[in-house]
């Protein structure tokens, strides 16, 4: 009996390994053939993701032209990325099909799904010749869609060039800060300060946050940069997609300027992945890889002024190269998000939240 038990255990292990490695053995041809049997790609994301319905229509047409498919993107606006990640985990654990065939999120969101073993394993760089290994932020699970360096944004009509900050530290420099004292906008989030502690350490960040609050004039969310453009606030301490904001507003004549806060720049890497239990898994895998093509990146640039620094010829790639700007390695923040939140980390975030509230 023991002999048979060992045999079936070994057989089960082989079957499990075969299933686990199935997607790694796929070829692009076999994926395209399988994808042609699926009629639509269900995508739930923010309302204006990838340019909203106009941008998604262009992506749909370009996708079908490249792969010879007749795919339709069934798009629905959904909750924020944290809520969508949590929903997928709940769906998978309960054995249900997931509500979106693909998931878009930054390091923190994808790390949550990775920790829960909720993502399909796909050998993207092995299957698709245009996908390089470094594009797989979580190897075999996620692929970079666009790069979002953080930074300061300010109104150049209100902040003289000789008084403009060159980094985060300048914001609280007594020689420069009188220019924006009492008028500085601060984002109401602790995440950017928590990530800054990976470079500066917790005590320096807490001291910095206190100094920011002392000269602040209000709070602005990352979607409210128009209030800097209008002059209501001359400057904002951090904006999560600073370069994209600058590239969106400057062609309209707005005096919005973005400045890196630290070097290398603290950066959000927005990646696509395929959650387990996807209804249309083959179209999903193709779409994740497709978003790194030049034609897909051109659509992102057209509608969102966003692109990947790892795709040759994109606005982001050229800007960083021409200005000799280095972005923070993904592994730095990924390591932070992959760790289970310990008591010290939670306490630090609570302290930051209290500081930002002025309490």
Locate the predicted segments by residue:
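Conserved C-terminal helix/tail region of periplasmic/extracytoplasmic solute-binding proteins
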Residues: 328-359
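Extracytoplasmic ligand-binding site segments that recognize negatively charged/polar headgroups
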Residues: 44-61, 73-89, 96-233, 246
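Mature extracytoplasmic/periplasmic domains
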Residues: 266, 270-335
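C-terminal segment of classical bacterial N-terminal signal peptides
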Residues: 15-23
């Amino acid at each position: 009996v023991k002999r048979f038990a060992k045999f079936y255990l070994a057989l089960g292990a082989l079957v499990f390994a075969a299933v686990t490695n199935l997607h790694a053995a796929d070829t692009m041809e076999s994926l395209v053939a399988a994808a042609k049997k699926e009629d639509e790609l269900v995508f739930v994301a923010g309302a204006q993701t990838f340019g909203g319905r106009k941008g998604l229509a262009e992506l749909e047409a370009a996708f079908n032209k490249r792969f010879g498919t007749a795919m339709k993107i069934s798009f629905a606006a959904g909750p924020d990325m944290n809520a969508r990640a949590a929903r997928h985990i709940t769906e998978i654990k309960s054995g249900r099909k997931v509500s979106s065939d693909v998931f878009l999120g930054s390091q923190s969101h994808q790390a949550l799904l990775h920790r829960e073993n909720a993502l399909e394993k796909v050998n993207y760089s092995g299957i698709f010749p245009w996908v390089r290994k470094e594009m797989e932020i979580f190897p075999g699970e996620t692929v970079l869609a666009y790069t979002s360096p953080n930074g300061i944004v300010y109104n150049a009509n209100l902040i003289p060039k000789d008084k403009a900050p060159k980094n985060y530290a300048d914001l609280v420099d007594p020689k420069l800060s009188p220019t924006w004292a009492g008028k500085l906008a601060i984002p109401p989030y602790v995440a950017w300060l928590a990530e800054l502690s990976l470079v500066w350490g917790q005590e320096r960040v807490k001291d910095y946050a206190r100094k920011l609050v002392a000269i602040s004039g209000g709070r602005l969310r990352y979607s409210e940069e128009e209030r800097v453009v209008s002059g209501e606030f001359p400057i904002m301490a951090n904006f999560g997609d600073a370069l994209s904001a600058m590239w969106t507003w400057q062609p309209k004549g707005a005096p919005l300027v973005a400045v890196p806060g630290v070097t290398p720049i603290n950066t959000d890497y927005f990646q696509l992945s395929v959650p387990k239990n996807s209804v249309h898994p083959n179209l999903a895998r193709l779409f994740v890889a497709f978003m790194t093509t030049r034609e897909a990146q051109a659509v992102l640039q057209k509608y969102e002024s966003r692109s990947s620094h790892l795709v040759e010829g994109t606005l982001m790639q050229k800007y960083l190269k021409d200005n000799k700007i280095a972005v923070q390695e993904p592994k730095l923040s990924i390591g932070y998000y992959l760790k289970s939140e310990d008591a010290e980390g939670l306490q630090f975030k609570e302290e930051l939240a209290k500081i930002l509230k002025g309490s």
